């Protein structure tokens, strides 16, 4: 775990600032007595800064608390970086199966069981408009009628707008032809009081994005993450 330290504001403070930071990092084992960064730590940070493929994670709780995550993958393996306020943790992981990625993707959630409801799909732009209208004061129940949500899914949708929910938005990216390229849409996992919901995008034949809402079983989350990143 490392702290994000504000830089010095005056050149006269530089020597004192550097001495204190080196002392702290040496005490933590990040640097050795000769002033060199531990090779493992250096490799983790290099992979996070220059990954071949990655997943960006944004966790949000009902009270507005936020955690950021970054899953970096490359020839050197997989490193997970999590940031909360001014603290960042780096963890090297062996993820050799899609379901092994699920605990990483949902680490900031409340660990709800999969919700039970009839799966349904909506055009992504329609769902975004409904979400905006609800945030601007429209009735959730009126939106359910407008969108034609199945009866079994209505309690889940209502709970998804409750203040007790927590969710993660996942966006994938990769280095391609020398450029960093991120996906246009993301996968979401939402923990509500009635269970976990998976929202995954697919492109329709006309090129429009469609969001599918399904129970958040670990296998489903893993499958969505794999299909989304390939």
Residue ranges, per PLM feature:
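Short, amphipathic alpha-helical interface elements at domain boundaries
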Residues: 1-26, 30-49
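Short, flexible beta-strand-to-coil junctions
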Residues: 60-63, 73-75, 82-85, 190-194, ...
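Surface-exposed beta-loop interaction hotspot
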Residues: 82-145
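Conserved small/polar residues in nucleotide/adenosyl-binding loops
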Residues: 229-230
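Hydrophobic protein-protein interaction segments
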Residues: 132-202
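Accessory beta->alpha helical hairpin/"wing" motif in late/C-terminal subdomains of nucleic-acid enzymes
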Residues: 32-77, 86-98, 102
